[in-house]
Amino acid sequence: ERIKTWPFMIFVVILTGVIYPIQGSWVWGAGWLSEMGFSDFAGSTLVHSTGGWAALAGAIVLGARKGKFGPNGQVNPMPGANLPLATLGTFILWFGWFGFNGGSQLALGSAADASAIAIVYVNTNLAAAAGVVVAMIMTQLMFKKMDLTLCLNGAIGGLAVPLIDKLKIDDVVGAISAHLVCGIWGTLAVGIFGSGQIVTQFIGIVSIGAFVFITSLIVWSILKVTVGIRVDEEAEM
């Protein structure tokens, strides 16, 4: 809605063709983080946090929408224009998680594999459902009414939107809260509740986050200086 198409596509190519494979090889390519015992079964850090760090860098360089933040720092609501379509998209994503998360087991040839996938399916559904319920309760307590967009983000996993707004970062689709924040939590949770080591998990989060964020910030800044990344004010409005 405020970014030029071609600079965005250039960044997508660099992210998927350069940044993502490098940090992915550190874990899934038997790299140094894998040797340390860092655990990321389905991509909490390698997929979700990576996208979140890249989105954070882009949002900082791009700047907020016109009128999003007032002169005194107040946040002006700018709700989406098609909530039914957003709701449909959330449920499509919810359904797709079963293939994405379950498929990370990479095998279905034994009872142990089937049992592991069943646990993944149950946890996936419970996590999304719990996210919706918590978002409904929290928005009712905080805003005196339920907010559909935050409830949808709750299913994906994010209630950090108010914090992002306070930092004056305009994240239209909630990518930072839903993917970055929850990706970090998902990775730490392995060290807290699972078989991973909390220190190793933290090292992985920091190292991958620093690499992706700094690299993305450099790429976005170069695109901004060379070809420009923001549409003119008339097109934005």
Predicted regions and their residues:
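Hydrophobic alpha-helical transmembrane bundles of multi-pass membrane proteins
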Residues: 1-237
